[in-house]
Amino acid sequence: MLYKFLFTLISFLMIISCSDEVESVTSVEPKVEPNFSEKPSPKAKLKERIKEIKITESKSIYDLENEYDTSNRLIELGWNKPLEKSPEFAITDDLSLAALNSVVEGVSIGTEYLGNYGPLKVFIIGSDIDGAKIVAKEFCEWARKDNIEYCINKDQGIDIVEMAIYKGNNGFAQHSRHLEPPNQSFVMGNPDKSAVKIAIHEYVHIYQNAHIVDGWWNDKEDDVGLPRWLEEGSAEILARYLVGDYADYLRESLNIAKYFKRDNPNISIRNLENEEDLRILEKKDCLGGHCVGTLQYETGAVATALLINQTSMDYFYKEYIPKITYLGGEKAFEISFNITINEFHEIFDSFLDEDHVFFWSKKKDKEK
């Protein structure tokens, strides 16, 4: 299955950015200059820059663990290590056993691939408002026990009750590093046919944040461990992969990302990492929806796929992400992919600027 995924990614990205067989929609045949052969085309330059992204001969996670000599509370508590204790689940009474099982299945799939991190408790909300209030209180007692009343009346407790009021099937994760002992959790509303995928997505956030600790490196204001686009993009990519929906999702996401770039040429994933830019984007609509959502999910997924295509699925999730604990987000990215985050932003912007037909026939899907 992993081989099939990588083959699909390679084929997909080659069709979009590297194939000489795909014709431009709007481009006019360029005039050949006398020294044309001496000047690499923009496409050739892009291909060479993409090749810069590669697996490096850096120290393994085991070497980094052995060399890490800075006292760290979360590392000493095993925050970044798999646990034997199984996740717990709380569910409102109006939901069925099938709803519970779909969420349990998603978490099980996530832990099977990534390992069992936590301690984790999952809260599943239906449409009964009184039931949601009960589970909201339970959530606050677990995840915000240092400030339960505030959580219930002014913070996430309200969000949980609103899931019942509006019958939302969204989710959110909470990472309570500051508690003694620390714990993790996520909340899901009204499980439907996408429940398994959503549960995996939220569990990926649990895994990501298990490797983000309070250390010297994240005292830097601009180093949050994972850029927003990579945090959401990598969660969605792995969730789609594990439920077998990556091909269609990648094709759709690339279309959306390219249209977004065409209509908003001065907006990119790098703007998500600037707080002032982020506040502006949160008030702006793009492609009929929120700019931030498109950049984090569809565009972030394509960017993540490009990194995975140049390395591997296991390398991305099981080598790169764990290194964040010991190196911080910026250094872990650079060490893992042979390129800085800012350099990747430049390459990815050029990738989206390529004006090619992007398509993938159903016949080719079936053949793969």
Predicted features along the sequence, with ranges:
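Active-site-proximal alpha-helical
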Residues: 258-342
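Solvent-exposed, acidic/flexible segments
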Residues: 92, 96-103, 188-200, 210, ...
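Beta/coil-rich, acidic/histidine-enriched accessory regions frequently appended to metallopeptidases
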Residues: 42, 46-49, 53-61, 105, ...
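Sec-dependent signal peptide recognition
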Residues: 2-8
